[in-house]
Amino acid sequence: MFVRIAAGAVAGIDAVTVSVEVNVAAAGQLGLFLVGLPDNAVKESEQRIRSAFENTGLRMTGKKLVVNLAPADLRKEGAGFDLPIAVGILAATEQVPAEALDGTLKPVRGILPMAVKAREEGLRRLIVPCDNACEAAVVEGVEVIGAASLGETVEYLRGDRTIAPAAASAAFAEEEGGYAEDFADVKGQAAVKRALEIAAAGGHNVLMIGAPGSGKTMLARRLPSILPPLTLDEALETTKIHSVAGKIGAHRGLLAERPFRAPHHLSSQVALIGGGQSPRPGEVSLAHNGILFLDELPEFGRNVLEVLRQPLEERRITVSRARYSVEYPANFTLVAAMNPCPCGYYNHPTRECTCPPGAVHRYLGRISGPLMDRIDLHIEVTPVSIQEMASAERGEPSAAIRRRVVRAHEVQRNRFRGVAGVYTNAMMTGRMVREYCPIDAEARTLLERAMERLSLSARAYDRILKVARTIADLAGDERIGTAPIAEAIGYRSLDRESWGR
């Protein structure tokens, strides 16, 4: 008897349909034969399935079983094929009308893109491990059945057990509950808050430079609280990435808050961009639609920082290896923080820098010029005074800042309506900058003078215009005057030749 079961495999952050074809041969060597480019984990499924059958009172046939995993040119990895192979064997041996060794079904990564693919293929029902049921149920149009064990699956297929479909409304689609960290708790730092508001409004990359204890990390961790809420499409895409990476816990809802990823400065290149023997998304993709925070930026390896150049420019990352090439989305806002020098107190208002001559310049030199050019806002963070710390007055709450940011985002979405892949000012191409960033003669003269005095690159010229466009959007102005240009130039601190000398 021949049976075909529909299963799925992950490719990047999407899924592909894998047909599990089981045939009971009338003659030939007894046993189970797996074909179709399985890896070692898939080949070992025979022993796991045999053990599960024995512990659930099921039987393997005493004939030759050939299991083909199609398409043959796609490498099949992991233990996620155990259930469809087992169900295929049961159907082929007429024991039903599809992992632990006791038959328990364990959760697998990437179930959300598999559910999306099942809907695209016209499948109406999906049987998954019960810990994955809430994750898969967010996909409308597919009935998701969560089974706890192989035995429970068999009983359901035989009609001996009823399992209610998983519901996304109560178990998955959670409302955003607000952020515990609020800008209202930050004393002083009005200039830095203003710069972070601009960054949030236009999707601009940020570098904060200041002494230890000046509040750089505290400010960065509050940035997600002023970002616009995730749209449904963004939430689904973000959740797919975390699903493929195995970061979605049991009974977790659709990710409703923008990601905030803060990898350690000892992180490897693979940890940052993704890859590995079985490819998984890295930190730049896990931060998609959110914030990638790199604290102590110069302490990261030079080769690690240089791989950021592609995702910062293209909003995606391509991981190529000998056996595969996958592409992951990586549309994040980079927020970096660093001390101004090795001792940390260069330009400090009260403490003296103890670094030898030239040390500050060499320290900043750990960050390459091309990477620095891709950072729109350079923010100097100074320590808060004792008077500001002792003040009982609270700062402006994140909710108020967020309302201004959301309005600016709406202006940008209307501006770029119909332009594929562009919805913030930071995403504009050079041609779009010329079209959407008109400046008057006085503002142009100011910008040209700054370019000459600061020896700025052509990329920095465009980034100043993008930031100025965002400043004008926050003010509700269509044209860009001298004030937005002057403020945007002020955020190019590290471009000044005098810095660090």
Language-model segment annotations:
Residues 60-63, 120-122, 140, 201-203, ...:
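Short loop/turn elements that form and flank the Walker-type P-loop nucleotide-binding site
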Residues 161-198, 202, 229-284:
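P-loop NTPase nucleotide-binding/switch module
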Residues 1-207, 211-214, 320, 460-461, ...:
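Peripheral, non-AAA+ core regions of ATP-driven protein-machinery
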Residues 35, 41-46, 61, 68-78, ...:
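Basic, amphipathic alpha-helical bundle interface domains used for macromolecular binding and assembly
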Residues 289, 295-296, 307:
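Walker B catalytic acidic pair
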Residues 102, 294-301, 344:
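Catalytic P-loop NTPase motifs of RecA-like helicase/translocase cores
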Residues 208-249, 314:
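Walker A/P-loop
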